[in-house]
UniProtKB/Swiss-Prot annotation:
Organism expressing this protein natively: Arabidopsis thaliana (Mouse-ear cress)
Keyword terms, alphabetized: Hydrolase, Protease, Thiol protease, Ubl conjugation pathway
SUPFAM superfamilies: Cysteine proteinases
The EC number(s) this enzyme carries: 3.4.22.-
Active site: H231, D248, C300
EC main group: hydrolase
Keyword Protease part of the UniProt annotation: yes
Gene Ontology process terms (BP): proteolysis
Keyword Transport set for record: no
Molecular function in Gene Ontology: cysteine-type peptidase activity
Protein name: Putative ubiquitin-like-specific protease 1B
Function text: Protease that catalyzes two essential functions in the SUMO pathway: processing of full-length SUMOs to their mature forms and deconjugation of SUMO from targeted proteins.
Family: Belongs to the peptidase C48 family.
Length: 341
């Protein structure tokens, strides 16, 4: 019986490899490697583009908020600002370096020594103690008075008025850096409109040149803190831009009355102090709608102070409700140091 050779089926791998197939396979491998390199390059370019866009956006924002000083940066990150357990501020050395790199003056983080200073001042053992005394205003701040800067508290007159005095002194220290401003205290508007209504005579002696050292009309901006029932708002006489401005972190619907009172006051003030008649009929009356607004029932006073702080710097109002814990802590530090930064 003859043996028949067994023939098995060939698979692709059994095919003889020709030189042309080898060249084709090698070409495909090189092409695939090139494609992979191209895709990696494309992803790298895309990531770089996104990063550049983010940086450009931050730069653009900084340029918008800086009006008075072109080299001042207004970008900030508020994710690490706030109170912990009621009064401890979250700042690590690494986070501080990052914040300093991106933050401008209005958002300068506190160091450990400053945080300890505030925590000690707010402690129960210092409630009855006079912590600081301001000679020019005769305002004493006790531990009890300072408690209003804890979270969820309404600001009081002493803390508000002392902070305004510190802003005035800050401006005097560096007049080239800030607008020339006048900061009325919290009792001015109450006197101006108390009793039967508007009464210029009640405040006419508040602004003599002998007391101020300057004429009120020569100021760029005049700030008028306003307390209505349990709510703080702000009136602004802007001599630079010839307009009267009203800012309310809530909407109380009384802006028109306040704007008219400020306009009438300016006319009477100029007439009495310089014997001149000023026509404000062409001045603007502005209720600021695009403004930071509070999201609770107790931060109105802090919003008012920050409106003043930012405007006196020549900055637009680039802050929000989430910054309030930080601003409360910073204000406490500045009052304890008797120096606004």
């Amino acid at each position: 019986m003859a043996l028949v050779p067994k023939i098995r089926n060939r698979t692709i791998s059994d095919k003889p490899v020709s030189s042309s197939c080898t060249r084709t396979s090698s070409f495909r491998q090189r092409l695939l490697a090139s494609c992979k390199r191209f895709l990696r390059f494309k992803l790298l370019v895309r990531a770089s583009s996104v990063s550049l866009k983010k940086k450009a956006a931050r730069c653009s924002q900084s340029q918008q908020v800086v009006k008075h000083n072109d080299d001042r940066i207004e970008e900030h990150s508020s994710s690490n600002r706030g109170f912990k357990d009621g009064n401890n501020f979250l700042v690590s050395s690494t986070e501080t370096k990052k914040l300093v790199a991106f933050c401008g003056e209005p958002f300068q983080p506190l160091n450990e020594e400053e945080v300890a200073l505030v925590n000690s001042a707010l402690s129960k053992r210092n409630r009855k103690k006079i912590l600081v005394s301001h000679k020019n205003s005769n305002i004493d701040i006790s531990g009890e008075t300072l408690q209003c800067l804890r979270p969820n508290q309404w600001l009081n007159d002493d803390v508000t008025n002392l902070y305004l005095e510190l802003l005035k002194e800050r401006q005097t220290r560096d007049p080239q850096k800030y607008f020339k401003c006048h900061f009325f205290n919290t009792f001015f508007y109450v006197k101006l409109v108390s009793g039967s209504g508007y009464n210029y005579k009640a405040v006419s002696r508040w602004t003599t040149k002998r007391k101020l050292g300057y004429d009120l009309i020569d100021c760029d901006i005049i700030f008028v803190p306003i307390h209505i029932d349990i709510h703080w708002t702000l009136g602004v006489i802007n001599n630079r831009e010839r307009k009267f401005v009203y800012l309310d972190s809530l909407f109380t619907g009384v802006g028109h009355t306040i704007l008219n009172a400020m306009a009438k006051y300016l006319v009477d003030e100029v007439k009495q102090k310089s014997q001149k008649n000023i026509d404000v009929s062409s001045w603007g009356m502005e209720y600021v709608e695009e403004r930071p607004q509070q999201q609770n029932g107790y931060d109105c006073g802090m919003f008012m102070l920050k409106y003043i702080d930012f405007y006196s710097r020549g900055l637009s109002l680039q802050f929000s409700q989430k910054d309030m814990p930080y601003f409360r802590l910073r204000t406490a530090k500045e009052i304890l140091r008797l120096r606004a930064d």
